[in-house]
Amino acid sequence: MLSRNVPKGDYLWGITRRIVDTNPGSDCVLDHVETNAMHRSARGALAVLLPLLLVASSARAQVPLPSSFVDAATVVDGLVLDMRYFGDHNFVGEKIDGYERPLCLLSAQAATALAEVQRSLAARGLGLKVFDCYRPQRAVAHFVRWARKIDDVRRKSEFYPDLDKRVLFEQGYIAEHSGHSRGATVDLTLVRRADGSELDMGGPFDFFSPKSWPSDSSVSVQAQQNRALLAQAMTRGGFRPYDKEWWHFTLANEPFPDTYFDFPVR
């Protein structure tokens, strides 16, 4: 066991020091030369072992991507990415925990199904643009912490102008778990393949309001038609919609219905 109050980088020297000091009443006393030699020996050992220990520590920190998950952009031809939680253009106003790269990770089954949707839209000159895919549980925890900070309303005007932040949990906008963490849910919209411009959906992604409900009739007729087109393409591809968010779809036959993953997006 290591001695207490020993700096992490000096743990070998801490062990050596304890060996020397454990029996102060002993007749065996190390002289100055022997002590210096011990110092040099310990430091030499540390110089050799520390890089190895750092590599081992790094390896433990590098949580591998499960073999059942893929980078959807390598499966879905022409998929447009706008990964909102990798940056600060989101309802929190900052990069979200767990998003280390702007990738769309999905279970292999969900990515394959999404590729079929993309192919079906190509005939119309349309394609898919994703905002979020797999979401680590630590990201959900970040949302929960933010929701409890009632005074943090940096993005209120853009994402929840008509909503009191204190009702986010009550009204279901924020929860302790998210289907995204199971790897088969995706937030997305439609774009024109010619120029990448988004179709009018009557409101932005992550807008906390009944106006985001797919059935909301207060948006323009064109927006209603575009929402219906997206929903039709996704349901035909094997996804089910969510009645509170026009952009949110989950693979009906998801492979991990009871598992909430927490590996980082990297």
Segment roles from a protein language model:
Residues 2-3, 21:
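Cationic, amphipathic, low-complexity segments that mediate targeting or membrane/lipid association
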Residues 16, 22, 35-37, 42-47:
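Ala/Thr-enriched low-complexity intrinsically disordered regions
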Residues 45-56:
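Bacterial N-terminal signal peptides
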Residues 60-133, 137-244, 253-266:
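Extracytoplasmic cell-surface/polysaccharide-interacting catalytic and binding patches
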Residues 249:
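Conserved metal-phosphate-binding beta-hairpin within the catalytic cores
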